A protein has these predicted regions:
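N-terminal beta-strand-loop-alpha-helix module at the start
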Residues: 1-69
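A structural signal for the main folded, soluble domain(s) of proteins
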Residues: 62, 69-71, 84-88, 92-94, ...
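A charged, amphipathic alpha-helical module
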Residues: 163-291
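Short His-Asn-centered micro-motif
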Residues: 2-5, 27-28, 67-69, 96-99, ...
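Glycine-rich phosphate-binding "P-loop"
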Residues: 62-77, 336
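C-terminal catalytic domain of photolyase/cryptochrome flavoproteins
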Residues: 3, 229, 248, 252-557
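Hydrophobic/aromatic-rich, well-ordered segments within soluble, folded domains that form packed cores
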Residues: 45-65, 95-96, 354-378
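Beta-rich, aromatic/charged-enriched effector core domains that present basic-aromatic interfaces
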Residues: 77-220
């Protein structure tokens, strides 16, 4: 049996596969698009990639039994689908690679068909190796794990020392674009939908019409060959600038210099070894600078493997983590993109349109607002898992609950990554023309990020005071007098009582402009400010600490 995120013909499931006597079983089931409200783009990617993979196996002459979502006798769950296949085919044995999600592993381990679960060779760190790394450590930190992985796999190493003489070049990868913007951004290597993908889009529109998001401009790789082409395009065209601008954001530019291959990796269309090797080869050939290559490899070899280790070590209780006792419902605008704050409108709008946002948009825009607002972690987790095409639970949950929300109390991150709107202003042009001023914490034009930042520190002062890394931010909080704190608390309360939006601010459904590709999509503004928009006047600085910029952090994208 092959699951939707196991599309690797070289996996352990196919060891000793004999086409004369063996068969492959795959299934599309409603439950996998229902247990969280999967977005149209995410569901399209999974189903199209599965169908392409099944077709490729069939073209080899292999027997493939495939349950489609619209089959008359289709079952509702994967467990039911497996039982139906076993009843119909009566195999001598059922084998499958271990599921990447706790929910499915538990379901199959208890299944009466008793499938034999095989290790997942896709990953560069086994469960046993991560357990050995974690043994005896009071706290786990990705940086130390990453160095071990570099040494074990001989990646970016010159003998026994790291290439260039240091392990981490994150300090060199923090640039914003400046007033002129990103300049010419290399075009993304999108793939026009073929007949299979178009059929899936039509099926989902008829069977699951209420899915969030869109698939009108779906162009994600759905085959291994397409994924390899996307990797090659990134290495050649965008990797050289990736390091400098991996944290930067710009209106109307959803793709920038990022790789856009996480979905292909997480469906196993790409192998992390080939991805890491391609990046290192580019540096050694002089085609990309070391800081860019090291920063990218850290995402794949470091963060991606690390969050998987954290997930399996912390489950099953991890999904219920709520260390800060956050109880605010996730605002409805996360599902619509209709919100007056320009940064949220941009980040959420492109997320719904493409199923994609890069790691800083996820961590320091949508994730930051949920943290400061005090949104229920399980609801935020469901949103991230639903919306993004690359979201699978083992990688999404630790990034969302641990990095973005600090709901795990410090398992993933050493501190909450809290900041005012000034961080977003520094790293993007989102604040230009926005009605809210990131320098203000109170008043009708105060940025909600800034208001909620100070309120967050005040509400959690006792807890955060036990964290030495929060000392500077709490010192700044102590400079605010009682009147300022009272005004901040009152505005924060009003924002929470109004579904996360300042009272009277209304909503903004779309941004318009000359760029037809962006103007048609809610929340996606053109690359320039909207015609007639005047710059927001700067208010007098007041309670303006931008917080601490995240370091050694990645929501892998």
């Amino acid at each position: 049996m092959v699951l939707g995120d196991q599309l690797d013909a070289g996996s352990a499931a196919f060891d000793d596969f004999d086409p004369a006597r063996d068969a492959v079983f795959m299934a599309e089931v409603p439950e996998e698009s229902r247990y969280v409200p999967g977005s149209r783009a995410r569901s399209t990617l999974f189903l199209s990639a599965m169908r392409h993979f099944a077709q490729a196996l069939a073209e080899r002459g292999w027997r493939v039994h495939y349950q489609r979502l619209d089959d008359r006798a289709a079952t509702d769950t994967l467990a039911e689908a497996l039982q139906a296949a076993v009843d119909a085919l009566a195999p001598g044995e059922c084998v499958m690679v271990e599921p990447g999600e706790w929910r499915l592993r538990e379901a199959f381990s208890r299944h009466r068909a008793a499938p034999r679960l095989l290790p997942d060779r896709h990953f560069l760190c086994s469960h046993e190796q991560f357990a050995a790394h974690a043994k005896g450590r009071r706290q786990l930190r990705m940086e130390f794990f990453y160095r071990e992985m570099r040494e074990r796999h001989r990646v970016l190493m010159d003998g026994e020392t790291p290439a260039g003489g240091q392990w981490n070049y994150d300090a060199e990868n923090r640039k914003a674009f400046g007033a002129a913007g990103p300049g010419a951004v290399p075009p993304r290597a999108g793939v026009a939908p073929d007949a299979i993908t178009r059929e899936v889009i039509a099926l989902l529109a008829s069977r699951l019409p209420d899915q969030p998001g869109h698939a009108e401009r779906f162009d994600w790789p759905v085959t291994r060959a397409q994924a390899q082409a996307a990797l090659a395009a990134f290495i050649e065209q965008r990797l050289p600038a990736f390091g400098d601008f991996q944290d930067a954001m710009w209106t109307g530019e959803p793709w920038l210099f990022h790789a856009h291959i996480a979905a292909a990796l997480n469906l196993k269309l790409l192998d992390p070894r080939e991805v890491v090797a391609a990046a290192e080869a580019a540096w050694r050939a002089g085609r990309a600078p070391l800081p860019a290559v090291e920063g990218f490899i850290r995402q794949v070899l470091g963060w991606r493997e690390y969050v998987r280790g954290i997930y399996w070590r912390a489950m099953p209780g991890y999904l219920e983590a709520n260390a800060l006792d956050a109880r605010q419902p996730l605002p409805a605008f996360y599902w619509s993109g209709e919100v007056p704050m320009a940064c949220l409108r941009e980040a959420i709008g492109q997320s719904l349109a493409f199923g994609y946002a890069h790691h800083i948009q996820r961590l320091m825009v949508t994730g930051l607002y949920a943290l400061l607002l005090g949104a229920v972690p399980r609801e935020v987790h469901a949103w991230y898992l639903s919306v993004y095409v690359d979201a699978v639970e083992w990688v999404e949950a630790p990034n969302t609950l641990g990095m973005a929300l600090y709901a795990d109390g410090g398992v993933m991150a050493s501190k909450p990554y809290a900041a005012t709107g000034r961080y977003i202003e520094r790293m993007s042009n989102y604040c230009r023309g926005c009605r809210f001023d990131p320098a203000k914490s109170t008043g009708e034009d105060a940025c909600p990020f800034t208001t909620l930042y100070w309120d967050f520190l005040a509400r959690h002062r006792a807890t955060l005071s036990r964290n030495v890394r929060m000392a500077l931010q709490l010192k700044n909080l102590a400079r605010l007098d009682a009147a300022a704190l009272s005004a901040i608390a009152a505005r924060a309360h009003a924002i929470r009582a109004n579904d996360g939006v300042p009272p009277g601010a209304g909503t903004t459904a779309t941004s318009t402009g000359a760029d037809a590709d962006t103007a048609a999509t809610p929340g996606i503004a053109p690359a320039t400010d909207a015609p007639g928009a005047s710059p927001r006047p700067r208010g007098r600085a007041r309670a303006t600490s931008a917080g601490t910029r995240p370091t050694n952090r990645r929501l892998f994208e």
